Design a protein with these regions (language model features):
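Acidic (Asp/Glu) and glycine-rich low-complexity loops/linkers
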Residues: 1-61, 66, 70-150, 158-168, ...
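Gram-negative outer-membrane beta-barrel proteins
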Residues: 125, 156, 213, 232, ...
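Eukaryotic tandem repeat interaction scaffolds
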Residues: 271, 279-367
Length: 434
């Protein structure tokens, strides 16, 4: 009984082997071009070009839709639109790739000064991820508005005067020497923007995954958003609002100005240096330090859940909160203090302006260095620690007990604005600025 079963199984196995061999032979030779099962495709490129006449006295509008390939647009001192096309095909041999490249189709449409370039990927299988591509290299008159929408490939636009709108699913995006409104969106890729003057228009940059770098920007509102990536502003000047948001990545803003500045990150360091903000400077950081150096603002609202806050140079209303971290403020001038840390030390050096002022730490020492001529009404309290002051205090209330609780209330230099300082566990030390 067992022998017929064994013979049957052997026959079935032999049939399957034959079918497998036949399939391999068929798929290897049955596809004349672009064999989807051949993972060793070779590339072949072909170049084509076309010159389009336009009215040089009127602005040009260029629209590019490219499913796969790089797009480069350059403005220049020309009176025509010059289009160079680079087609790239893949197949198992050079001969097959040469045939395949002939099948790549794209379109160039013109309606007056409006030009549209388009390449769509054919709906065919290709398991080795090598898809046919079309690169568009375009030279346009300087006064040209540009719109680019591509799925795979790098995008670069430079030297144009007009609105620029760039969208890319996967690939880096670069814009340089633009005069006009700028909008860039990418799902995955770095974005680099340099030398943009949008006038009273906006600059808006978004990417899901990738770093954002902006340098030498002038606009009304400037915004940069990345779900995962660092954001860097250098010499960015917004007459309106400046907004930066990244979920994961450091934020750096150096040399610039804005009416308002908002920086929001879930995880990363925030560093702002030599930036002038006429109204509010607001930062929110879940995990990371906040560092401000000579960042002048009408008011400050700084908050981090876990990280230190360091400020060198400030003026006006200053609110700084951290759940876990130290707060250090130096070279402050006429500030209104609202400072708190749940766990960490607080160090302040500078002058106080209009009150009331409040400084609080749940666990940590508080050190304040104030001018010798500071006029304040003070209320100092610590549950576990000591209060010391090198500035003379006219005491109206003092309390000390064996439980280590210490409280002192009174006035400095005849009194003035209210300063309240408290810590649950730590000392309070008041010194004079030398």
């Amino acid at each position: 009984m067992k022998r017929p079963v064994v013979i049957t199984l052997l026959v079935i196995a032999l049939v399957l082997v034959c079918v497998g061999i036949g399939s391999v032979i068929y798929f290897a030779n049955g596809f004349q071009t672009n064999n989807p099962f051949d993972r060793n495709n070779l590339a072949l490129m072909a170049e084509e070009s076309k010159t389009l006449k336009v009215d040089a006295e009127k602005p040009v509008t260029l629209n590019v839709a490219d499913d796969a390939g790089d797009v480069t647009v350059t403005g220049g001192d020309v009176e025509t639109v010059q289009v160079k096309v680079v087609k790239t095909a893949y197949d198992s041999t050079q001969a097959r790739a040469a045939e395949e490249v002939k099948t790549i189709k794209y379109t160039i449409e013109q309606n007056g000064n409006a030009i549209t370039l388009k390449y769509e990927i054919p709906k065919s299988m290709n398991f080795n991820n090598n898809i046919n591509t079309v690169d568009f290299i375009v030279t346009v008159p300087t006064e040209t508005s540009v719109s680019v929408d591509t799925s795979f490939g790098a995008v670069a636009v430079q030297g144009v005067q007009g609105a620029v709108d760039l969208s890319n699913d996967f690939g880096d995006v670069a814009a340089k020497n633009i005069e006009g409104e700028l909008v860039i969106q990418s799902n995955s890729g770095e974005i680099n923007v340099e030398a943009v003057d949008a006038g009273d228009k906006n600059v808006e940059i978004k990417t899901d995954f990738g770093d954002i770098t902006l340098e030498q920007i002038k606009a009304k509102d400037v915004s940069a958003t990345s779900n995962s990536g660092a954001v860097t502003f250098t010499n960015v000047r917004a007459s309106g609002d400046a907004y930066i948001k990244t979920d994961f990545g450091n934020t750096t803003y150096e040399n610039g100005s804005a009416a308002t500045l908002t920086v929001d990150t879930n995880s990363g360091k925030i560093s702002i240096t030599k930036v002038n903000v006429t109204k509010e400077l607001k930062t929110q950081n879940d995990f990371g330090d906040i560092n401000l150096t000579q960042a002048m603002a009408g008011s400050y609202d700084l908050h981090t859940n876990s990280g230190g806050i360091t400020i060198d140079g400030a003026k006006g209303k200053l609110k700084a909160y951290t759940d876990f971290g130290n707060i250090e403020i130096s070279n402050a001038k006429s500030v209104t203090l609202d400072v708190k840390t749940n766990s960490g030390t607080i160090e302040f050096s500078g002058s106080l302006g209009a009150g009331p002022h409040k400084v609080e730490s749940e666990f940590g020492n508080i050190d304040l260095a104030l001018p010798t001529d500071a006029k304040l009404n003070v209320d100092f309290k610590t549950d576990f620690g000591k209060i010391k002051s090198s500035l003379p205090i006219t005491v109206t209330l003092t309390e000390s007990s064996s439980s280590e609780e210490d409280q002192m209330a009174g006035s400095i230099n005849g009194g003035g604005e209210q300063l309240t300082v408290s810590t649950n566990s730590g000392g309070i030390n008041i010194t004079a600025i030398k």
